[in-house]
Amino acid sequence: MTMCSGARLALLVYGIIMHNSVSCSPAAGLSFPGIRPEEEAYDQDGNPLQDFYDWDPPGAGSPASALRDAYALYYPADRRDVAHEILNEAYRKVLDQLSARKYLQSMVARGMGENLAAAAVDDRAPLTKRHSDGIFTDSYSRYRKQMAVKKYLAAVLGKRYKQRVKNKGRRIAYL
């Protein structure tokens, strides 16, 4: 509704400007490049007079320029700068909140929601690096557990485990 009324206001202002420029201009606000006077007109000193067919009246412009002029008339530059600054601050706050919310959701999804203080210290590392580090840590801890189980089995089974390794030529996993 507000955009519609704003567009109507801009159209009204543009219509008023165009109406005034058409009724007040010597060439009726229109340029006819194909129509030229037969002879040129000169003033008292012999200088040629201005050609009204090549002259653009100051009020006739594109609708965008009329809208800019109306905007500049009602909203001075100093007020616009303050408004833009306030808008930029609010936009930045909203983006910060969205990024923080997205970060917290990713932390909860990964199951690290209980360790937020430690994660906040390491904010500089990208999430992909953290993810790959987590995969490596999980794989390495799994490997260490497997080696511990093999070592335990070797100690319990003793000689029998070593014989099987020699006979087969490779290690036998008891997992």
UniProtKB/Swiss-Prot annotation:
Subcellular location: Secreted
GO biological process terms, semicolon-separated: adenylate cyclase-activating G protein-coupled receptor signaling pathway; adenylate cyclase-modulating G protein-coupled receptor signaling pathway; behavioral fear response; cellular response to glucocorticoid stimulus; histamine secretion; insulin secretion; negative regulation of acute inflammatory response to antigenic stimulus; negative regulation of acute inflammatory response to non-antigenic stimulus
UniProt-recorded Gene Ontology molecular function terms: neuropeptide hormone activity; peptide hormone receptor binding; pituitary adenylate cyclase activating polypeptide activity; pituitary adenylate cyclase-activating polypeptide receptor binding; signaling receptor binding; type 1 vasoactive intestinal polypeptide receptor binding; type 2 vasoactive intestinal polypeptide receptor binding
Gene Ontology cellular component list: cytosol; extracellular space; neuron projection; neuronal dense core vesicle lumen; perikaryon; terminal bouton
Residue span(s) of the pro-peptide: 25-78, 172-175
UniProt xrefs under InterPro entries: Glucagon_GIP_secretin_VIP, VIP/GHRH-like
N-terminal signal peptide: 1-24
Modified residues (Leucine amide): 157
Major subcellular site: secreted
Origin: domain of life: Eukaryota
Entry similarity comment: Belongs to the glucagon family.
The protein's name: Pituitary adenylate cyclase-activating polypeptide
The organism of origin for this protein: Rattus norvegicus (Rat)
